[in-house]
Amino acid sequence: MRVGVYPGSFDPITKGHLDLIERAASKFDKVIVAVLININKKGMFSIEERVNLIEKCVAKYNNVEVKSFNGLLIDFVRKEKADVIIKGLRSVTDFEYEFQMALMNRELANEVETVFMVTSPNYSYISSSAIKQVASFNGEIKNFVPKEIVEDLEERIISLRGEG
């Protein structure tokens, strides 16, 4: 059984993330979306909320699970008995960083491969950070996030502004 782990912050999940999850689900027997708990970062959504939002988006896939983790990614991958780390690449800059991380993970666990998946061109400019910036200035975000979470995101933005 081929198990892939797709790690990230997903704050919030984007259409680019979902596209990659869908494509990975067609290539692996099981895909685990691993939501990173980063205590040094104040997210828009709590870890539990991010897990729930992603679960809404991937509910139609029988072979996709969503779990949170903290600590080393490679420890989580081993615990889940996965053999592949899935990484999305939007740009050369992404590749440089992810290549270095893949080499580090390979050194820590040479039995685990890293697979790079190139982002679909129509999503290559989308990032969670950019979405948050657009939203903070009342910009329209529905073209950037999965339809399943547009309302959740809009409600959170209103509450963060103190309008709700």
Swiss-Prot record:
Keyword tRNA-binding among UniProt keywords: no
Cystine bridges: none
Record bears the keyword Lipid biosynthesis: no
Keyword terms: ATP-binding, Coenzyme A biosynthesis, Cytoplasm, Magnesium, Nucleotide-binding, Nucleotidyltransferase, Transferase
Reactions catalysed: (R)-4'-phosphopantetheine + ATP + H(+) = 3'-dephospho-CoA + diphosphate
Any GO BP: coenzyme A biosynthetic process
Pfam family, any one: CTP_transf_like
Enzyme class at the top of the EC tree: transferase
CDD domains given in the database record: PPAT
Binding site for ATP: S9, F10, H17, G88, L89, R90, E98, Y123, S124, Y125, I126, S127, S128, S129
SUPFAM superfamilies: Nucleotidylyl transferase
Assigned EC number: 2.7.7.3
Pathway note: Cofactor biosynthesis; coenzyme A biosynthesis; CoA from (R)-pantothenate: step 4/5
Gene Ontology cellular-component terms listed: cytoplasm
Subunit and interaction comment: Homohexamer.
Record-stated family: Belongs to the bacterial CoaD family.
NCBIfam families hit by this protein: coaD_prev_kdtB (TIGR01510), cyt_tran_rel (TIGR00125)
Role summary: Reversibly transfers an adenylyl group from ATP to 4'-phosphopantetheine, yielding dephospho-CoA (dPCoA) and pyrophosphate.
HAMAP family named in the record: PPAT_bact (MF_00151)
PANTHER family the UniProt entry points to: PHOSPHOPANTETHEINE ADENYLYLTRANSFERASE
Name of the protein in question: Phosphopantetheine adenylyltransferase
Species the sequence originates in: Clostridium perfringens (strain 13 / Type A)
Biological classification of the source: Bacteria, Bacillati, Bacillota, Clostridia, Eubacteriales
